[in-house]
């Protein structure tokens, strides 16, 4: 992938950009095999990759510069701002949005937040695009609601320029820390969720719900999990750390009982909406802590699917699963180091199948799907 920002030394986020994709995949596979070297693996499936540029469905832009000449991108460690509107990881459809947002920031008087001076209002611009219909969700992360009335007043102009903006919100993040969002979300549009569709499964994206940033590879990840589950004798499963329900909604059949657990209530609202659209009445999604939910249950289903954050599922949940011993565990991980650590805590299971998904090209990161079977 060619990147003028990298060539000019202005951005180093894609540390592996100089390596061809096949070399990147080989290095990631070697890393994964090294992490799982202590465990016999019955089947290594071929790694899955997608496009090497223009694949991201989301931009998280730090806003800096002045209100008349805002920069959208990042801050270097020394505080120097860098405009990343031309980053080749973004699809071409993002360029007109960035181009319209810069004059809009001036129109609405949204002074960029200055970290050194602790002054200004606009901290971040968060943009998400649906692959299904090209609709977009735009979030303005502000320090306070001081500029809210001005923003609302200027909004018709932005809608005129960018009719693809289906959901627009203001998020209030008052803390002087590098935290992307606060708890308060103010909707400026009637529509509150972005419609997405992977493999004919309707999915919804709300402002404070996690959604994979590489849709081409994520849709293959969900489809693979579905195929693996269909090969197993499963009538009842848990989907822990389920997010908007991507895994559970793909894996469920009309006669299957499924419980999806996720701490974020916004994500659970999305999952419930999708289940209703699919007419799946035996799916139950609840906004709870996954570990607390599981460890409070007196029995387990045949299959437990886990998709934890980078820290992994942790010892308490590993101990519970070791004791209760479901027949199958499917572990989807964005951090193979913590997954390997967790598998070490599950001695009663063997690894039947592993597959790497190159969700983050040009970096050392990857996603991995693992099928564990009770010995």
UniProtKB/Swiss-Prot annotation:
Entry-linked Pfam families: tRNA_U5-meth_tr
SUPFAM superfamilies found in the cross-reference section: S-adenosyl-L-methionine-dependent methyltransferases (SSF53335)
Physiological role: Catalyzes the formation of 5-methyl-uridine at position 747 (m5U747) in 23S rRNA.
Binding site residues for [4Fe-4S] cluster: 3, 11, 14, 87
Catalytic activity: uridine(747) in 23S rRNA + S-adenosyl-L-methionine = 5-methyluridine(747) in 23S rRNA + S-adenosyl-L-homocysteine + H(+)
Family the entry assigns: Belongs to the class I-like SAM-binding methyltransferase superfamily. RNA M5U methyltransferase family. RlmC subfamily.
Organism: Escherichia coli (strain K12)
EC number: 2.1.1.189
Gene this chain is encoded by: rlmC
This protein's name: 23S rRNA (uracil(747)-C(5))-methyltransferase RlmC
Annotated GO MF terms: 4 iron, 4 sulfur cluster binding; iron ion binding; rRNA (uridine) methyltransferase activity; rRNA (uridine-C5-)-methyltransferase activity
Keyword tags: 4Fe-4S, Iron, Iron-sulfur, Metal-binding, Methyltransferase, rRNA processing, S-adenosyl-L-methionine, Transferase
Residues the entry annotates as binding S-adenosyl-L-methionine: 212, 241, 262, 307
Keyword flag Lipid metabolism: no
Catalytic center residues: 334 (nucleophile)
Xref: InterPro entries: 23SrRNA_MeTrfase_RlmC (IPR011825), MeTrfase_TrmA_AS (IPR030390), MeTrfase_TrmA_CS (IPR030391), SAM-dependent_MTases_sf (IPR029063), U5_MeTrfase_fam (IPR010280)
HAMAP family membership: 23SrRNA_methyltr_RlmC
GO biological process: rRNA base methylation
């Amino acid at each position: 992938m060619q990147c003028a920002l990298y060539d000019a030394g202005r951005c180093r986020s894609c540390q592996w950009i100089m390596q061809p994709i096949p070399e990147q995949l080989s290095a990631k596979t070697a890393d994964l095999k090294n992490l799982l070297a202590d465990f016999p693996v019955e089947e290594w499936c071929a790694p899955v990759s997608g496009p090497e540029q223009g694949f991201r469905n989301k931009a998280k832009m730090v806003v800096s510069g002045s209100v008349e000449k805002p920069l959208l991108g990042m801050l270097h460690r020394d505080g120097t701002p860098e405009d990343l509107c031309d980053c080749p990881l973004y699809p071409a459809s993002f360029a007109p949005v960035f181009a319209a947002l810069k004059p809009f920031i001036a129109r609405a008087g949204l002074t960029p937040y200055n970290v050194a001076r602790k002054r200004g209002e606009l901290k971040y611009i968060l943009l998400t695009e649906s692959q299904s219909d090209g609709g977009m969700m735009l979030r303005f992360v502000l320090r306070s609601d001081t500029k809210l009335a001005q923003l609302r007043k200027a909004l018709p102009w932005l809608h005129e320029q960018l009719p693809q903006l289906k959901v627009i919100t203001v998020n209030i993040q008052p803390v002087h820390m590098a935290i992307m969002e606060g708890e308060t979300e103010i909707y400026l549009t009637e529509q509150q969720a972005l419609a997405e569709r992977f493999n004919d499964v309707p999915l919804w994206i709300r402002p404070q719900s996690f959604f994979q940033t590489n849709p081409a590879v994520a849709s293959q990840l969900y489809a693979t999990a579905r195929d693996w589950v269909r090969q197993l004798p499963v009538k009842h499963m848990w989907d822990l750390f389920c997010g908007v329900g991507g895994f559970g909604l793909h894996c469920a059949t009309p006669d299957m009982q499924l419980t999806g657990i996720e701490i974020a209530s916004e994500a659970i609202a999305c999952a419930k909406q999708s289940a209703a659209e699919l007419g799946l009445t035996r799916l139950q999604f609840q906004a709870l802590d996954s570990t607390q939910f599981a460890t409070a249950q007196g029995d387990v289903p045949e299959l437990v699917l886990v998709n934890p954050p980078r820290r992994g599922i942790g010892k308490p949940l590993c101990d519970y699963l070791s004791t209760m011993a479901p027949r199958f565990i499917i572990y989807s991980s964005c951090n193979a180091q913590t997954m390997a650590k967790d598998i070490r805590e599950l001695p009663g299971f063997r690894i039947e199948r592993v597959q790497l998904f190159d969700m983050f090209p040009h970096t050392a990161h990857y996603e991995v799907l693992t099928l564990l079977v009770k010995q």
